[in-house]
Amino acid sequence: DLNLKIFDLTHEIPPYNIWEGAYRLYQTASYWPQGSVFVSVVDPGVGTDRKSVVLKTKNGQYFVSPDNGTLTLVAQTLGIDSVREIDEKANRLKGSEKSYTFHGRDVYAYTGARLASGAITFEQVGPELPAKVVELSYQKAKATKGEVKGNIPILDIQYGNVWSNISDELLNQAGIKLNDTLCVTISEGSQQKYAGKMPYVASFGDVPEGQPMVYLNSLLNVSVALNMDNFAQKHQVASGADWNIDVKKCAK
């Protein structure tokens, strides 16, 4: 179909990192229109009995992926309309039946292209499954008086800024305002990796060079940075389902 538009969102997901694949889908999906078909293949279980599915979200988008946790965040934020298992007898690249390790090409890209072009309908993808997907466990963002807690899903890797899943709405619910002094604690599982004080400011230039700060990133989520330095590298902070952050008001 010469009218079909194909966009590469990224080929930079670290190998086997299902969590980062899940976050990048969440980060980008809302900018695309109803009817968009996303193909996401982070598939360390390729060739095993994990299911290959197409998720239709409540806003009318389609996500073609292994059902291994990749769909966690789009399912939670966009809502599940329905899920279908890919019928590989009907929706698999012809001649690839003996290939067990390249389902990205043989199953997912093939099915996604056929669905996006109208060669098949959503109903022709395969049998309908219960309206749920495999979900990764992580710290959901929450607010109490003077304090917010959440997960560190991703790093702004070029600059070493630490992004959380804590929204500006939750910050407001906690009563945290610009120029408040905040105590920030970052942990990997039960192990504390960082604890320190810093101001909540609008932008990087509001603190001296090399100093820490809390700010809102482009998604309007709570983030931590060093002005013109690399916070994640300096403090050995990473991201993922096991990385958590606690931010609360404290004395200067």
Predicted regions: what they are:
Residues 1-15, 22-26, 156-161, 166-170, ...:
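Intrinsically disordered, low-complexity, positively charged segments
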Residues 38, 182-184, 213, 241-246:
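Generic structural signal for buried aliphatic residues
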Residues 94-178:
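Anionic-ligand-binding alpha/beta catalytic cores of soluble enzymes and soluble regulatory domains
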Residues 228-230, 234-252:
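Pepsin/retropepsin-fold aspartyl endopeptidases
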